[in-house]
Design a protein with these regions (language model features):
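Extracellular/periplasmic carbohydrate-active domains that bind, remodel
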Residues: 1-320
């Protein structure tokens, strides 16, 4: 029952703590750009429950600053998050990594970037992540899973992620319009970005299950504004960007409106529904360098009615 309001930087940071319980807190901090709502860094055994976050920067953020440590055994439940960055974020600092993280019953709204961003970009291990019961409204992106290599030679791993029971609505306009510190308009030109799971060549995101997922997109992708096709030349031209700061929009225009998956193994879609409210020139899903994928239980509602809504390129063992 504690309220924090308008910090000058990160509102609160818990660094290398053990057996920490945080319950019924309120964060209302929109005074400056770097107002993370809460940062849990290289901790072991944290429970964050029944709390509300309205923050300019990432609302609920897990970090790992120490390559010899790890952020693990974290439970977050019954929380509401609003941000001009991401609602729930693993990273960007991910030196040691994240393990055994469970998040349940989370609502994200009016959020400029991602509802869920899981980033392994600094050489750490990210594994055994469970996200269950997520409701996301007026948020620019729903799911962003990313392997990067910001420190050359430090290979990260992202393995065993389950995201289930999600309902999300992606708006056509800017989700945080009208807030005092809005997220910066960047990575243009691009139409509405899809959810994405992206590794690197030889560094695969592995074993991801998406179950009972419904995402409603505005559609309306206009090829005269920005266009990436699904031919080999166009798909191969999408940059890898291993050292770039990871954001769902970093690739600019992507060739799918629903999901873009590249450099991944063991991807399962189980009862996933993707809806575009207006015709979009792009297919719903593009798989590139994906090996082992089950997309048989996918429903696509596209007023454009394309013959091929799931494009498979340079991939093997894909069921659709």
């Amino acid at each position: 029952n504690v309220t924090w309001k308008n910090s000058a930087f990160w509102v609160q940071i818990y660094d290398q703590c053990e057996n920490l319980n945080i319950d019924r807190i309120t964060v209302d901090s929109k005074a400056f750009w770097n107002n993370d709502g809460i940062d849990i860094v290289d901790c072991n055994g944290v429970k964050l429950t029944n709390s509300f976050f309205d923050a300019t920067d990432d609302a609920i953020c897990l970090k790992s600053h120490d390559p010899k440590s790890i952020c693990q055994n974290i439970e977050v439940s019954n929380c509401v998050a609003r941000s001009s960055a991401s609602g729930i974020k693993f990273g960007t600092a991910s030196r040691g990594g994240f393990r055994n993280i469970k998040m349940t019953n989370i609502k994200v709204y009016d959020t400029y970037r991602s509802a869920i961003a899981i980033q392994a970009v600094d050489g750490g291990l990210v594994e055994n992540i469970t996200i269950d019961s997520l409701h996301s409204y007026n948020t620019a992106n729903v799911i962003f899973l990313r392997i990067g290599e910001r420190y050359e030679g430090e290979k990260a791993k992202l393995n065993n992620v389950t995201i289930s029971n999600v309902y999300a609505e992606v708006p056509a306009g800017k989700p945080d319009a009208g807030y005092e510190y809005e997220g910066p308009v960047e990575d243009l030109p691009r139409n509405i970005s899809p959810a994405s799971i992206t590794g690197l060549p030889g560094q695969y995101v592995t074993n991801v299950t998406l179950k009972n997922i419904t995402i409603v997109y505005p559609g309306g992708g206009n090829p005269n504004y920005a266009k990436v096709g699904t031919d080999a030349k166009s798909l191969n031209a999408i940059p890898e960007m291993p050292k770039a700061y990871p954001e769902f929009s970093q690739f600019k225009e992507l060739p799918a409106w629903g999901f873009y998956i590249r450099h991944a193994k063991g991807i399962t879609f189980d009862n996933v529904t993707l809806t575009a409210e207006k015709p979009d020139y792009r297919p719903a899903i593009v798989l590139d360098d994906v090996h082992g994928g089950d997309l048989e239980n996918v429903t696509i509602n596209d007023p454009g009615k394309k013959k091929n809504e799931i494009v498979v390129f340079q991939s093997t063992d894909i069921k659709k």
